Design a protein with these regions (language model features):
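Rossmann-like NAD(P)-binding element
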Residues: 1-8
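Glycine/Thr-rich phosphate-binding loops of Rossmann-like dinucleotide-binding domains
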Residues: 8-9, 84
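Rossmann-fold NAD(P)-binding glycine/threonine-rich loop
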Residues: 9-17, 21, 25-48
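Conserved beta-strand edge residues that scaffold enzyme active sites
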Residues: 29-30, 53, 124
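Adenosine-phosphate binding glycine-rich loop
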Residues: 42-82
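C-terminal catalytic/substrate-binding lobe primarily of soluble NAD(P)-dependent oxidoreductases
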Residues: 67-211
Length: 211
């Protein structure tokens, strides 16, 4: 299923009833947990979170841990961005605006001091350079998939952040917090995708570090 996260549960139930395999790209944590519960009685394989993040970045991070006998930190970063950013946001909604709003507003699951905990989205900003390109990174929800459950007690720190062109996070905080758009997620998504529609020339940046 490549549908927005809020439509995936119905598709998953249909796959479960038909006894066929199910895959999706969702980043939504409650949706994922519901599908994993379905998988316990499914005849087919049910695998949510098979996209870029969660999905690919988790595979990269997990692979890197194979070179270590003891883990201190797993730091994962992903940015899907327009190659030629315009305006102050420097962004284009090349995938579900509902999903972007979701990951900007929901709490983020991380491991800190060896234990799973929740932290706010759009926080803990950092500067990062990818091949000389200046980007910012900040916490967003859902990017780790089920990695926290996998690595709890095995690593001191595990976190995921989204990368954007500098200044994006501050503007998004203003949009959601100061303008109270967090209270109307549907309208927020419509406004954002209308302002920053999809583009053909996009690029994905990935950064994974394991200590």
């Amino acid at each position: 299923s490549c549908l927005p996260y809020n439509l995936n549960i119905n598709v998953a139930h249909a796959a479960h009833a038909a006894g066929i395999h199910y895959f999706d790209l969702t980043e939504d944590v409650p949706t994922t947990k519901a599908i994993l519960e379905l998988s316990e009685t499914s005849k087919g394989l049910m695998a949510p979170q098979c996209g870029l993040a969660p999905g690919f970045i988790g595979i990269v991070g997990s692979h890197l841990t194979n070179d270590f006998t003891k883990l201190r930190a797993i730091n994962l970063r992903v940015g899907a961005l327009p190659q030629n950013p315009t305006g102050l946001l420097g962004y284009a909604f090349n995938w579900s605006p509902a999903g972007v709003v979701n990951e900007y507003l929901n709490d983020c699951e991380v491991i800190k001091d060896g234990k799973i905990m929740a932290v706010p989205a759009m926080e803990d900003n950092e500067t990062i350079f990818i091949s000389g390109l200046h980007l910012e990174a900040f916490t967003t929800s859902g990017g780790l998939g089920t990695m926290c459950e996998t690595y709890e007690g095995k690593v001191d720190e595990l976190n995921y952040k989204t990368m954007r062109y500098p200044g994006h996070c501050e503007l998004m905080r203003f949009f959601f917090q100061e303008l109270h758009m967090k209270n109307d997620r549907k309208a927020a998504g419509e406004i954002l995708v209308n302002a920053k529609p999809p583009v053909n020339d996009d690029v994905v940046y990935v950064h994974a570090a394991v200590e």
